[in-house]
């Protein structure tokens, strides 16, 4: 597809006219062609850009996430470097292991595949998962001690806590052990806290299964867990990705729920990855 055809295809989604005005620019070794469309949705102009350089092409509209935009410019100038093997570690429970979905459907696998698609063919990505259905924070701590993972990962994700809530564990256990898990996770990326992504806890109240367990109380309790994790991350400067609202659409959008009526589906995990990916691209270097 030509650059103009690609731009017009993108603009079509905004009900724009098909007569773009283009402007060619250079940014260092990059060639940037920018298209501007008028008469679009809500009478606003939108822009679409094609970036080319070092054998890599990145195209995006003006609503592109800033992290992705920055990454696009850097990766496009990175064509001569040596091949790399990026290592990803995913820590958690059933939401990380992908209960009731296929192995390639769970969010860590989808994230790995998206990263592979964004990087040069010569690069490799490997994934290790330490997670199991039913694990609470104590279980994950013990499993990490047993597994003795290496400390040279390039990216770590942490999603944990739903079973503390479901099993009725004292909240102060989560408060203590969440911080300990964060510290352990950071140690596995060479003590570089910027390489950690904490993911919020899904809300299972909005599933057929969750409707049987006082869903109003469930949601309220999970708010406490997620608020604590978010505030902890904000206080120490960690990345936190909120995906809970996606799962809160599970009753009105059944395709977000797996066949067991409880866990997220492949489709839901794809939506998780859409939010995680921009941060992952900025962190994996």
Mark where each language-model region is.
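Solvent-exposed loop/turn segments at secondary-structure junctions
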Residues: 53-58, 94-97, 132-137, 161-167, ...
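C-terminal catalytic histidine-bearing segment of alpha/beta-hydrolase fold enzymes
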Residues: 8-81, 281-284
